[in-house]
UniProtKB/Swiss-Prot annotation:
Annotated InterPro entries: Ribosomal_uL10 (IPR001790), Ribosomal_uL10-like_sf (IPR043141), Ribosomal_uL10_bac (IPR022973), Ribosomal_uL10_bac_type (IPR047865), Ribosomal_uL10_CS_bac (IPR002363)
Pfam families documented for this protein: Ribosomal_L10
Keywords tagged on the record: Ribonucleoprotein, Ribosomal protein, RNA-binding, rRNA-binding
PANTHER family (alphabetical): 39S RIBOSOMAL PROTEIN L10, MITOCHONDRIAL
A GO CC annotation given for this chain: large ribosomal subunit
Function comment: Forms part of the ribosomal stalk, playing a central role in the interaction of the ribosome with GTP-bound translation factors.
Protein name in UniProt: Large ribosomal subunit protein uL10
Name of encoding gene: rplJ
Protein family (similarity comment): Belongs to the universal ribosomal protein uL10 family.
PROSITE patterns: RIBOSOMAL_L10
């Protein structure tokens, strides 16, 4: 590979790193071309899976400001550059690795934080961002409804007490008005 080609390849990988929310490094030794194609389909549109040269990718990672991946650039390496939801990509890689043991997760980074292969597997066990946000919104809605009930209860109690006090005063004033009339009739 000529120096100009290497420079262009590094620049392309730098852009991939900078444009990605996550990147997962894998070892693909033993996978066929059809299996790699199947993996790319399984990862979906938000993820680009590329076989890379370790030296060039290491240089590109340094230039992109991605740290903590140096030990992972050993053996045949492919990188899943994730521009969408990292959880969905991690699930796709985990599930494919279960079905095809030749695919080995090495590690990667998510939102700038280096992650081990075990951490990526744990990430895959999480629910997607949309599901977590929906659950949070539901919990907040329930909490707010409960708070409204708590605030409304004392107000309704005060209203009932005020009504009872008004009725009691009306009853007393009617009783006081009847007393002078009864005294006048007795005289």
């Amino acid at each position: 590979m000529a120096k100009a080609e290497k420079t262009a390849a590094v620049a392309e990988i730098v852009e991939e790193f900078r444009g990605s929310t996550a990147a997962v490094l894998t070892e693909y030794r033993g996978l066929t071309v059809s299996q790699l194609t199947e993996l790319r389909r399984a990862l979906g549109e938000g993820t680009r899976y590329s076989v890379v040269k370790n030296t060039l990718t290491k240089i590109a990672a340094e230039q992109a400001g991605v740290t903590g991946l140096d030990d992972l650039f050993v053996g045949p390496t492919a990188v899943a550059f994730v521009s969408g939801d990292p959880v969905e990509a991690a699930k796709g890689l985990r599930d494919f690795a279960r079905a095809n043991p030749a695919l080995v997760l090495k590690g990667g980074f998510v939102e700038g934080k280096p992650m081990t292969a075990d951490e990526i597997r744990k990430l895959a066990d999480l629910e997607s961002r949309e599901v977590l946000l929906a659950k949070l919104a539901g919990a907040m809605k329930g909490t707010l409804a409960g708070a409204v009930g708590l605030f409304a209860a004392p107000l309704s109690q005060v209203a009932r007490l005020a009504e009872a006090l008004r009725e009691q005063r009306e009853g007393q004033s009617a009783g006081v008005a009847e007393q002078p009339a009864a005294e006048a009739a007795a005289e």
